[in-house]
From Swiss-Prot:
LRR repeats lie at residues 287-310, 397-420. It comes from the Eukaryota. It comes from Arabidopsis thaliana. Coiled coil: none annotated. Residues 4-50 form the F-box domain. Keywords: Leucine-rich repeat, Repeat. This is Putative F-box/FBD/LRR-repeat protein At5g44960. The keyword Repeat applies. PANTHER family: F-BOX/RNI SUPERFAMILY PROTEIN-RELATED, PROTEIN WITH RNI-LIKE_FBD-LIKE DOMAIN.
Amino acid sequence: MEECDYINELPDSLLTQILLDLRTKDSVKTSVSSKRWRNLWLNVPGLDLFSLQFTNPHHEEGLIKFMDRFMESNCRSRLQKFMIRYFECNGYRDRFMELIGTVVDCGIQHLYVYMHTCNRVDFIRQNIYKSKTLVSLKLYNVELKNPDFVVSLPCLKILKLMKICYGEDGPLVVEKLISGCPVLEDLELIKPFDILTQDVILFLRVSSQTLKSLRLYFATNGSVEIDAPRLKYMTFYESRFDRIMVKNMSSLFSIEIRAKSSFEYGGLLKAEDPRKRAIICDFLTVISSVRHMIISGSILEELHSYSKLGWIPQFRNLYHLQASFFGTSLQLLPTFLESCPNLKNLIMDYGAFKEENIDFHEVPQCLISTLEYVHINKLMMMEQSGIKLVNYFIENSAVLKKLTLRFSFFSSIESESYKKLLTSTKLSPTCQVIFV
């Protein structure tokens, strides 16, 4: 019985879509397969160009011919994707920029530009920011000045700006870009810089009626205002704000705060710091309808300090919590869980840098009625605070189905010794305690 060559039975249109998932250098290699495949790569509706592969100056002419040949084959039909990684060692930046303009004019849908250069390229060009076909735009290490024209990107859904340098009107540039994207759904901003001072932009306003996902990566203090009624996913990573204003968060499903301190501007919360207390209170209240939360240990440290001075709102919709508890923030655990009365899943990253004298007395409502799955990471064998923590869940969780304990160092002999230290009787008879 002859083997069937399923690949060669596929039409060219489907094969080129498959090759689109490969880097261009890999799709070119398929040309040696057979006569049919010789020029098939030229019809792939995407180009992934990695300029570091052409560091030899003598390769420049060949590279330009390669690009021209590819564009001649593809510009008659619309390209779907163009990705370029440019390194300073090459001497043909202008040719690359001309190529980018050409692919935009050809109706590109997905444009990704990564410029690894010391002198950033000015990337404000009318044909790019008035494209009627761009669906996603990702830029790295380029310069964006305030455009003297109206930005219009009617199809753009994904905008990712990484280490972008702006002029003195930096915040206005971002606002213009966002306002010119009427169907924008996914926005990511990573360390935006002022081109004159090299300082991170200190003020940012994000206003969009269509935005669903927002990720902010800031390294220094600043202010941010967010007005996005359809926002479902929000992430702050290494971001610190001395002022944060969010509104219209009724659609928010998930929030992730992975930062040293998102509210920091001069140390931990103090009683004489009413402005900071108000910022935290307003922020927590607005996000209190969230269902899924990931939060860092540094933020919990701040919340522990805040809980002594103010109130933590009820997160009544929260069913999944992933949090890092270490140091004094571990004392916040019962209080924080009390604010999550319907919590079902809890993932804890536990860190005991020193022996903490923890003594839990309160039993939150979620332990009695809803908490079914607890996963504790980074436990240490024979470390007393961790043992108390595990015993706390065992003896107080009425509906717990699975308690998973993950140790930094683990052996089967040690696990048996650890089990003997768990002296509490399981309140939930069906609970499984799993060591990994």
